[in-house]
């Protein structure tokens, strides 16, 4: 795996390609700087990784175990911690920062975050089931239809698509393109949409698979 960066979704806008004039929809993400709060090596933990923090808060917002952990790296109090496994963590030191210059325009990235929670939703909204006839006399407008067979097996199989909570799950959108980097304001502009609503916490890493 590769080192990534944590950020917050600010919203969407559009920029124009200087050569073609085509409007490009982009998501603006405020990312970093993320201090390195822990370095793990095979000698200490059995594997290589670094832990980074994001989202400065006051000390009173954190509990004592977390404050004690952060004081070992002399890091400022941060709300979120995230670990990235590496092949070799010797190149990183406690207190170093991960910034948006980790990426450059044209890079492909994977963006992970929590989708917008939509609460308890029905079959059509949650699973795109076909709606029943809306004509006079129809008693099936938004019903699910059959949920299984008869006496055998005599039960509904686990995993059957039914009504329930929709959204609010961790997802990863892969191979998005970095359009622009603003190192002064710690901003990354990524082509297309990313999970969640404005204010959502995101993890941005170099694309795991590159190609078709």
UniProtKB/Swiss-Prot annotation:
Protein name, entry field: Large ribosomal subunit protein uL3
Keyword Glycoprotein: no
Recorded name of the encoding gene: rplC
Molecular function in Gene Ontology: rRNA binding; structural constituent of ribosome
Ranges where the record places region Disordered: 130-158
Subunit comment: Part of the 50S ribosomal subunit. Forms a cluster with proteins L14 and L19.
Role noted for this protein: One of the primary rRNA binding proteins, it binds directly near the 3'-end of the 23S rRNA, where it nucleates assembly of the 50S subunit.
Keywords per UniProt: Ribonucleoprotein, Ribosomal protein, RNA-binding, rRNA-binding
PANTHER family: 50S RIBOSOMAL PROTEIN L3, LARGE RIBOSOMAL SUBUNIT PROTEIN UL3C
Similarity section: Belongs to the universal ribosomal protein uL3 family.
Top-rank taxon: Bacteria
An individual GO BP term: translation
Pfam families given in the database record: Ribosomal_L3
Annotated Gene Ontology cellular component terms: cytosolic large ribosomal subunit
